[in-house]
A protein has these predicted regions:
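Structured alpha/beta or helical-core interaction and ligand-binding surfaces enriched in interleaved
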Residues: 1-75, 80-84
Length: 84
């Protein structure tokens, strides 16, 4: 199941919303940044990733849900929740 969400990309993502969807305080980070593959606190990961302004994915610690934020070829941001 994939759910596309609308988000104002000029402001940081809401960590409480994303933690609520992921169902965990901790998440795995998939990105081009220094924390790629690491298990981090969700709020801290979001702060760092927002500042880097790159595409990324956060995967719940149990691997069942994910949050993806990406940019397409026209530099339009898109955000998705994914549930396995």
């Amino acid at each position: 199941n994939v759910k596309k969400i609308f988000r104002q990309f000029e402001t940081p993502p809401d960590p409480e919303l994303i933690k609520g969807f992921l169902g965990s305080e901790m998440c795995y980070v998939i990105s081009h940044g220094d924390n790629d593959g690491n298990l981090l606190e969700t709020a801290a990961a979001l702060d760092e990733l927002y500042l880097n302004n790159m595409a990324y994915m956060l995967i719940s610690s149990n691997g069942e849900t994910a949050y993806l934020e990406a940019e397409n070829e026209y530099s339009r941001h898109r955000a998705y929740f994914l549930k396995g």
